[in-house]
A protein has these predicted regions:
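Hydrophobic anchor at the start of a short beta-strand
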Residues: 8, 30-32, 115, 162, ...
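Phosphate-coordination loops involved in phosphoryl transfer and adenosine-cofactor binding
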Residues: 4-7, 90, 136
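Internal alpha-helical scaffold of NAD(P)-dependent oxidoreductase catalytic cores
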Residues: 20, 27, 48, 108, ...
Length: 235
C-alpha cells in the first residue's frame, strides 16, 4: 500500500457504499474486502470491485483501515454492536446515513475507532453513472473536530464537495434530501403516467424538458413563497 493509502472494507450492500468504495479505489486506496455482493447493481462484485474479497463482516474489520457501513440507517447501531469485539484503535468507521451524525458510532469509538459520518447528497442507481454523478455532488460530513479534516479529505478524493452539517441540523438536512428525492420520483412517475393515458409516445422524453426547466428555475429562485402565478401550467 502506498504512503497515505488505506485498505478499505465494506460492510453491507447498499449502492452508496459500493460506489464510494469504487471512488476511493480510483483515488488510489485499496478496496480489500466486502461482506456482501451489491444487491442493487446489474454488475457483479468482480466487475465493480475486482480486488475485493467477499468475506465475513468480522474479517472485513480485520483487513480494513477504513470501514464503510453500507447498511440502512435503522440498522447502524445494531451493526456496530454486533461487531463490538472486532473494532480496533485507529480504524476509521464511516456510516452513510443522512439523519445521523458521527455520534451514532459510539460503540466503535469505545474500542478506539475514529467515527466519520459521510452522506452523499444524491440518489444512487447502482450503475456506473453513480461515479460520474458523485463528482457533481455534495457530501454531508460530521466527525469529531480532530477527525473532521479526514472526512473532508476523503470526500475531496472521491471528487465531491464536503459540507459540514452540525448535529442539530442533521434532521432537517435528512428531511430535505428525502423530500427532494422521493417527491421528484413521485411527480415524474405521475406525469409519465398521465402522458401514457393520453396516448403520447415516448412520454419520458416529452416530459423531461419540462421537468428540467422547472427544476432549474426553482433552484435559481431559491426558497421563497410560491405564488399562484408560479403554478400556471402553460406559463
Amino acid at each position: 500500500m502506498k504512503q497515505g493509502r488505506l485498505n478499505v472494507g465494506v460492510v453491507g450492500s447498499d449502492a452508496s457504499g459500493i460506489a464510494m468504495a469504487q471512488a476511493l479505489a480510483q483515488a488510489g486506496h485499496m478496496v480489500v474486502a466486502v461482506s456482501q455482493a451489491p444487491l442493487d447493481s446489474d454488475d457483479s462484485l468482480e466487475v465493480l470491485l475486482p480486488l475485493a474479497k467477499k468475506v465475513s463482516e468480522e474479517k472485513v474489520l480485520e483487513l480494513a483501515d477504513l470501514v464503510l457501513l453500507a447498511v440502512p440507517a435503522a440498522q447502524i447501531e445494531a451493526k456496530i454492536e454486533s461487531l463490538s469485539n472486532s473494532w480496533r484503535a485507529g480504524q476509521l468507521v464511516v456510516h452513510l446515513a443522512a439523519e445521523f451524525d458521527h455520534e451514532i458510532l459510539a460503540g466503535a469509538v469505545s474500542a478506539g475507532a475514529i467515527p466519520l459520518a459521510i452522506h452523499p447528497a444524491m440518489r444512487f442507481t447502482g450503475t456506473s453513472l453513480d461515479l460520474n454523478r458523485m463528482k457533481e455532488s455534495f457530501f454531508a460530513v460530521s466527525a469529531p473536530v480532530v477527525a473532521l479534516p479526514i472526512a473532508q479529505a476523503l470526500v475531496i478524493e472521491m471528487g465531491a464537495e464536503p459540507i459540514v452539517i452540525e448535529s442539530s441540523a442533521r434532521a432537517s438536512y435528512a428531511e430535505a434530501i428525502e423530500v427532494a428525492s422521493n417527491f421528484s420520483a413521485m411527480i415524474v412517475n405521475q406525469a409519465i403516467g398521465l402522458l401514457e393515458q393520453a396516448g403520447v409516445p415516448n412520454p419520458a422524453l416529452v416530459i423531461a424538458p419540462v421537468i428540467e426547466s422547472a427544476v432549474d428555475q426553482a433552484l435559481s429562485k431559491g426558497h421563497r413563497q410560491i405564488k399562484p402565478e408560479d403554478l400556471i401550467g402553460d406559463s
